[in-house]
Structure formats: structure tokens, C-alpha cells
């Protein structure tokens, strides 16, 4: 397989984990922000997580630097544009990017400005490149809950014009879904689709709860359903797609190593699995790299890959028109 040339779809990619290191330097200069170095290799080393982190929380420390310079409309628009540009150049045909609007208010932007800026950057890239995209709004679970509905309201203005879904992200505690039932319902009532980070850090029950309590149609990661029979069967029965991120899952110790990742078993058992980057910079990866890793480690043929691509199309939060156009790339 020519991994670079193959058409690709990425349904699980974080904006603040996919910023170009040089852009962090540029934005810091423009905004007069002190950063540890103006050497791109030094900055990259602060943004890329080690191949093996002790846990997810250690991995998440790599986001502080890019977020510090993503506090203006121009910065958000640029970072969004560049992510879509980078993806388009490796034949990603459709990209869903998630980000937490709550993280970008340090210089006084409101949620409409924050969301509008990233959508604008995406639309600029769509006009220049053969790529389509949408945004997912991630609620950061470690932050106060009092402005969650405000985020949902602000995003509703952009629903189906660049924003499509609601997500919960950040470190994963057992039983977290119970606290977010009213917020997920509020988002659903507004017309959002739902995908939830769950089952990344060893808690299969969280996947069960995300589907049964929050209405999740997709699950971010979900790998620990392999030790929770009820969650596994619910994922199958409800045809819930799993957003697998192989490199990231090894880095965060969600799995011990790539050989122990359940992706191949899930695929062969008929679960709806997809291949995604998670964080292009923090995991120092691309869709090309993730596809090659998955193909080689899980013994996927080109036909297998086309089947996974179709699963990604069918479970994308895209319009029917966009889905039809995406299927033409493998016709």
C-alpha cells in the first residue's frame, strides 16, 4: 500500500495537540508572550510527549504551551487553518477536529469569537485544498461546569455550518458520565451529535455509561471494553463506532505496547473501528503514520483499509452530500 497516497479520514484529532512548533514561536512573538526558547527543536521537544508516558496526565502536560498562545482570534484562525492544511497535504479528505473553547478565554474572547475563529480557519483551508471538515466542542472535565451550557449555546449558532458535536475530554475517572447527563441532554436537544472520550484509561464501564446515559454515537478510544463484557456487547448492539488512536494509546499507557492493542481483534470481530491521530504534534504522528502502523501491526490488507475507511465515512458527523463525495475516493 502507498500509505501517503491513500485517501484518509481522521475523526479524532485535537486542535491544541496538533499545532506546528514554529507557529507557537511565531504567535508568541506576535503576542509578546515569553516562551522557553525560540529554537524550533527546543519548542518541539516541549510539545511532543515521550514514546512512553507513565499515564495520560503526564501526556496532557504537553498542551499548556500551545494553549498559551491560542488566546486571540487570529491565532485560533491560523492554527485551525494550518491543521487542515497539514492534513490535506497527506490526503486526509475529511477531518473532524475537537477543541475546548473553555481553554481559550485568557485574553477576554467570548465563546462565539473562539468557535467562530476556528471555523473560519477551517473554511479557509476547505476553499484552498481538497479537504472537508467539522468541529467537535470538547468540554474539559477538570474545569468548572457553570459555563458548559454557554459553550453549547455559542456553538449552536454554528451547528451544521462547521460545528457538529459535543464531547467530554481530559483525564478519565470511573463514573464521570453521571455528572454530565443534563449537559449531554441539553446538547442533544440543540441538535448536537455526541462522541465521548471513554474506556481510554482502563474503565470499560465508562463506555457503557457514555452510550446508555449520555447518548454517545461514537466513543473516543474505547479500548477497555475488551475487559467489560456488557460495554462490549452494547457497542456492538448499538453500532457505536470506536475512534482508535494507536500511537497515542501506547504513549499514554492505555495499552502496554502496540502488539497488545485490541484494534485488530475488534475489527475482526465486526466492531466499527476507525483509525485516527489524536494529536499530530503531541504524538509526533500523521494519518499516514497511523495507517502504516495499523496495517503492519494488525495485518490489514488494502481491502481491510477500504472497509475501515467506509466505517469512518458512515460514522462521520458529516452531511450526506459530503459522505457521498468521500466514498468516491475508494470507488
From Swiss-Prot:
Site (Important for catalytic activity): 221
Active site: 200 (proton donor)
Recorded GO CC terms: cytosol
Binding residues for substrate: 14, 16
Binding annotation for Zn(2+): 12, 14, 197, 278
GO biological process terms on file: adenosine catabolic process; hypoxanthine salvage; inosine biosynthetic process; nucleotide metabolic process; purine ribonucleoside monophosphate biosynthetic process
Catalytic activity: adenosine + H2O + H(+) = inosine + NH4(+); 2'-deoxyadenosine + H2O + H(+) = 2'-deoxyinosine + NH4(+)
Function: Catalyzes the hydrolytic deamination of adenosine and 2-deoxyadenosine.
Protein name per the record: Adenosine deaminase
Species the sequence originates in: Shewanella halifaxensis (strain HAW-EB4)
